[in-house]
């Protein structure tokens, strides 16, 4: 670990040039193990201890690199166990280990916080690393004043060579990039790494660390160019063409084309200029909202389609970008069904002896629980059928009664906690009913009894498990003033401890 610290303390330019030797260091794979990203692969290899396993990894890397430079490429077949062995060991197993370690190595040039983590220092919290619930107060503040929104699904597929060439401007170690290119092309047919799609690929979730790094880097590259163009549009004319091209990281600079291209691009940006433009993204979905007219949003849509096609060489389907008017359409974002609706209000005004009513409409940001997709997620998880009728959970029937009740109660509390910002929480009662009755059916199945008998015997206890913290606080504090309690319960509450969407709320 001390050696790893010394490496991280090198100059940034030196780090870029000496990434390759780290692939042969055992502590890299130990570090990948310590992060807990795939412990079973490193530990559950029967017949070998950790040291011998890491030595086999190093031997396998050497063998792969020899094959790579001899142009004697090979592809592992998941159906042929004989072809999947090198040195008498399973190559898929050790290839997974290599990919985990390789992901750690490639991340090093991008990680400026690892030294603080290794030294036990407190990591300074970035403003970008806040709860995802912090997005909604921003939407409440900004979106009622906007007119249109671009609902964008970011492309998941990208050409292999484009990805490697993009990384080349950050990681200047040619050997590491050759090895990355080798992995991407040779393992294109290996389902645990990538999903084959001719010369492009979409990332697989089984290889979490490498998947997250490649996808985040892909999105970062996409956003760095887009956000730069958005921020610089108002004062682009004061930037020289040389600085302009350096900041965008164009890979081929044609001198006689610079002047013409810059002038044309200034005109494009001037057409798309809008001081009331807001951009928000979470995972693979982003929103671009504006106070402008539909013509401006169509120009931005045209820009996105051409940007993806010309820069990433990916054909963009028209259905990946939707233009919606906020007052007439809802959009699905972060598990909520959101919209901007007009709330009528009447104001009584009196002048001298005459009084009259003034009607006024106030724009309000509305967030609803998408009950139909949520029931669909519960159906996939085998808590109910497609119509929303609760069913038992047979796989949990072997657990103790307290564990079964605790699991069902925890699922509802998590969903209720996440959807605490909903404008109308009545839909959550439907979810509570499904989970509560599914729990009762599971217990009845376990004890070979009827649901009625269990609800009669454990009714109050079972109901208590599904009380959320907010309901408990309100019921204790406002026991007599029930109307006040109901009013507080209807209010939206955004929690700042939510860093990811619940799997059931994600509808995937």
Swiss-Prot record:
It is found in: Plastid, Chloroplast. Keywords: Chloroplast, mRNA processing, Plastid, RNA-binding, tRNA processing. InterPro entries: Domain_X, Maturase_MatK, Maturase_MatK_N. One of its GO terms (molecular function) is RNA binding. GO terms for cellular component: chloroplast. GO terms for biological process: mRNA processing; RNA splicing; tRNA processing. It holds the Pfam family Intron_maturas2. Its main location: plastid. The keyword Iron-sulfur does not apply. It comes from the Eukaryota. Belongs to the intron maturase 2 family. MatK subfamily. Usually encoded in the trnK tRNA gene intron. Probably assists in splicing its own and other chloroplast group II introns. This is Maturase K. It comes from Manilkara zapota (Sapodilla plum).
């Amino acid at each position: 670990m001390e050696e790893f610290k010394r490496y991280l303390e090198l100059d940034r330019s030196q780090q870029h040039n000496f990434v390759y030797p780290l692939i042969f260091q055992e502590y890299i794979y130990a570090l990948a193990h310590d992060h807990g990203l795939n412990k079973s692969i490193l530990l559950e290899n029967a017949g070998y201890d950790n040291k011998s396993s890491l030595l086999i990894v190093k031997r396998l890397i050497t063998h792969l690199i020899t094959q790579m430079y001899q142009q004697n490429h090979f592809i592992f077949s998941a159906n042929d166990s004989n072809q999947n062995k090198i040195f008498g060991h399973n190559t898929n197993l050790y290839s997974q280990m290599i990919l985990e370690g390789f992901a750690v190595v490639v991340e090093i040039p991008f990680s400026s916080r690892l030294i603080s983590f290794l030294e036990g220092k407190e990591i300074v919290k970035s403003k970008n690393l806040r709860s995802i619930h912090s997005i909604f107060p921003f939407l409440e503040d900004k979106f009622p004043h906007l007119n249109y929104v671009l609902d964008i699904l970011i492309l998941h597929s990208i050409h292999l060579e484009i990805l490697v060439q993009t990384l080349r401007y950050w990681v200047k170690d040619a050997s590491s990039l050759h090895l990355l290119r080798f992995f991407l092309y040779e393992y294109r047919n290996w389902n645990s790494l990538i999903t084959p799609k001719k010369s492009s690929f979409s990332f697989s979730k089984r290889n979490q660390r490498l998947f997250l790094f490649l996808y985040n880097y892909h999105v970062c590259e996409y956003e760095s160019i887009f956000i730069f163009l958005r921020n610089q549009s108002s004062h682009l004319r004061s930037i020289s063409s040389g600085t302009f091209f350096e900041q965008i990281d164009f890979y081929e600079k044609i001198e006689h084309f610079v002047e013409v291209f810059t002038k044309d691009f200034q005109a494009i940006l001037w057409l798309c200029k809008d001081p009331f433009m807001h951009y928000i993204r979470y995972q693979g979905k982003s929103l671009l909202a504006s106070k402008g007219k539909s013509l401006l949003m169509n120009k931005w849509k045209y820009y996105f389609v051409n940007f993806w096609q010309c820069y990433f060489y990916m054909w963009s389907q028209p259905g990946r970008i939707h233009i919606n008017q906020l007052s007439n359409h809802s959009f699905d974002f972060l598990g909520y069904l959101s919209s901007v609706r007009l709330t009528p209000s009447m104001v009584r005004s009196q002048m001298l002896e005459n009084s009259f009513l003034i009607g006024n409409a106030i724009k309000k940001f509305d967030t609803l629980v998408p009950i139909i997709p949520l029931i669909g997620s519960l159906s996939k998880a085998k808590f109910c059928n497609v119509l929303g009728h609760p069913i038992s959970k047979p796989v949990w029937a072997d657990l103790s009664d307290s564990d079964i009740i605790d699991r069902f109660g925890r699922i509802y509390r998590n969903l209720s906690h996440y959807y605490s910002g909903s404008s109308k929480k009545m839909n959550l009662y439907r979810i509570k009913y499904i989970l509560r009755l599914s729990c009762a059916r599971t217990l009845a199945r376990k004890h070979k009894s009827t649901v009625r008998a269990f609800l009669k015997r454990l009714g109050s206890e079972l109901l208590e498990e599904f009380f959320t913290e907010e309901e408990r606080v309100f019921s204790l504090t406002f026991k007599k003033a029930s109307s006040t309690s109901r009013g507080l319960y209807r209010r939206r509450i955004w929690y700042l401890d939510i860093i990811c969407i619940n799997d059931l709320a994600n509808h995937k």
